[in-house]
């Protein structure tokens, strides 16, 4: 927050996403209106639903910008819309559906694969330059790849996904992150295998 002037960067990122989606739909269709709603900040879900209803819209499709499964990234959104419909007296008069989580879609995974590829190239160039001028850093000479994500409490992660399934890492939230990490590494290995020489993850 400090690096962004005391505000969350997410609203500005959502405005940029909204503009990009509007442009893409204007160019390719379908020609449908797109609006933006927030759970915890203006514009609030209930206000946006009320306005959409007043403008004659009866079917709403929600895209939550959180890619992975979990209570706060999936079910809580559904609950928020359900509560808003009840509060506004619109239950049964307006339908709200939500797009599935997108952690495993090619475009999402590819962005991270491209980032890892570019990052490995840069780090390897920096390491080579330091070796060339005799200022090599301490260590074993291997590059450690670390995948990190939004932190959620273990109890919240454990609430992600159906019960009775033996998820890798203990929850669907952890398992899906591991699947994406492996898919990213597999893409780099397939297309630029030498970049993974002398790396650990």
Q: What kind of region is each of these model predictions?
A:
Residues 1-201:
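Active-site-proximal alpha-helix that buttresses catalytic centers in soluble enzyme cores
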């Amino acid at each position: 927050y400090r690096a962004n002037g005391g505000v969350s960067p997410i609203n500005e990122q959502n405005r940029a996403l909204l503009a990009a989606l509007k442009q893409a739909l204007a160019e390719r269709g379908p020609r449908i209106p797109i609006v933006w709603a927030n759970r915890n900040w203006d514009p609030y879900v209930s206000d946006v639903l009320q306005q959409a209803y007043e403008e004659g819209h009866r079917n709403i499709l929600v895209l939550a910008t959180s890619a992975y499964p979990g209570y706060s990234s999936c079910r809580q959104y559904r609950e928020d819309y359900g509560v808003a419909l009840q509060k506004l007296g619109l239950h049964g008069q307006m339908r709200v559906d939500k797009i599935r989580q997108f952690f495993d879609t090619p475009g999402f995974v590819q962005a991270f694969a491209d980032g890892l590829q570019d990052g490995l190239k840069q780090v390897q160039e920096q390491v080579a330059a330091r070796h060339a001028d005799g200022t090599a850093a301490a260590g074993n000479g291997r590059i450690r790849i670390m995948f990190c994500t939004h932190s959620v409490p273990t109890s919240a992660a454990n609430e992600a996904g159906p019960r009775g399934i033996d998820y890798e890492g203990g929850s669907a939230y952890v398992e899906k992150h591991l699947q994406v990490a492996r898919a990213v590494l597999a893409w780099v290995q397939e297309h630029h295998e030498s970049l993974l020489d002398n790396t650990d993850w």
